[in-house]
Amino acid sequence: MKKSILMAALGLLSLNTIAQDTPKEEGFIFTTVKENPITSVKNQNRAGTCWCYSGLAFIESELLRMGKGEYDFSEMFIVHNTYLDRADKAVRTHGDVSFSQGGSFYDVIYGMKTFGLVPEEEMRPGVMYGDTLSNHTELTAVSDAVVAAIAKGCLLYTSPSPRD
């Protein structure tokens, strides 16, 4: 019995030695039909502002595709102004409007229409503490708490101007 088990095991192991290499097939080769120009890839780092980075990258690429020139708009300009606007709306509705880092493509369009656009050189990300990239960890923690405290407060009067 032991002999037959040993012979069966050796027989199975020998199958591995006579296996032949299969020829490797080449993968699918893509052919570029149309290549649109794009702007450089930006790093949002630790800021929940992907909505602004992707939205402005789309707009910059579309301007480039249409032959309108190469632009690098400031994401932080749109983010800064929309956060102020969101904070004002959250306070006026006593917290019934979402105040968070997230957003959508329409927030970029709204920011362009309402506040305009500026070049990246005018308002770079990470201008605090010598950083070169955005880090909104502290900003989010503080601004969420401040807006929530004001929104749930018992103030009877709110200034008509959000920037007063």
Residues of each region from the PLM?
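C-terminal edge-of-domain segments
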Residues: 154
